[in-house]
Amino acid sequence: MGAQKYLFILIFILYAQVGHSQVPGFFLDENTRRMDIPFLGYSDLIIIQASINDSEPINFILDTGVKANLLFSKTLGDELDLFYSRKLNLMGADGKSILSASISPNNQINIPGLDGIAQTILVLDEDFIGLDKVLGIPVHGVIGYEFFKFNPVKIDYDRNIITFYRSTVFKRRPFGYRSIDMPLVNGKPYINGVIRQADGSSLTVKLLVDTGANHGLLLNVETSDKILLPETVLESDLGTSLGGDLSGVVGRLSRLKIGRLRFKRLITSFPDPTEFSDIIIETGRQGTLGSDILSRTRIILDYTREKFYYQKGEKFNVPFEFDMSGIALRALPTEDKRFYVHHLRKGSPADKVGVREGDEIISVNGIPVEFWELTSIIELLRSEDGKKVKIDIIRQSGQVLMTLTKNITLRRQI
């Protein structure tokens, strides 16, 4: 079965099963004009707590890049006593993996002061994503289009606050903000940007606004023969998505212009084409705008008016940096904090001093990992060219468990 058919089935099933007595969506309590919702910011992703059918609160990523609400574990869905109407097969983002899931219609997803009514949830039979390993904290699912579709939502990355507005009281552009058009296609928001490439040429690109992607700019080279790779690129693991890890190269673009914002020397990902590429091409988009760029701004997403409001945030002028060590870290699925080397870039500073894939990190700069967040170590490893970082590791060699110290000098490679 082709990717198009999988997507059609998904969209049809998710929205054909809701009764007509309730309109699916998220709604403020009566007489409330706006609601501030705090969120956790990990790797610039937005993590909020919500309950399903009066359960204890669990962690969700707020993600404009998906239409369906997702729960990553059927085990958790069973514990929540969810009703499942049928099974479904999905194609993963790598274009190869086939994922099985169950459809649970007509649920309540509640945040204090905000009610998610008649919500359909796609429950994965297995946790194919493993965001716990990537972020180092439990993440149970994703809330997508339904959260945004009726009401303007402001995201303040500086204060880690979401403001959910009643649409009738949000009638004009707020002071200090500018706006551009943001058309919705299949429940997903798109804006136009202009990139300046290595040969000096400029190219207008259609970008998916994706708060659930922790990269900066991603460009799909298969969508246009006018997209050029930068002169210097690194092969890299580009991250984890529904259906597996994505690979490709990263480099720097000299500039991205969005409205009156200009982002300079930005890190840009160029994923390898997959069987899923046909779906991307059909949307007409050339890439994705992720949270490493969005988090440098304050934005208001107004789906009903199809407007993207923006202003500079406190981190706007912070330089874009990529990992300078060569280490991609993951967390082990244990109660105590345990981090290991998931991937090692060949020829990188860590590779040159003898770090290996599978090594477990037990301390960084003399501080045990119990006192580190995974995202804080990742930020350290891309912080400053020439910075020295000492890591203590445990390595299994046959029946022998060795403790080693490695001194890494960070080097900017792009």
Regions picked out by a protein language model, each given a short descriptive name:
Residues 20-414:
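Pepsin/retropepsin-fold aspartyl endopeptidases
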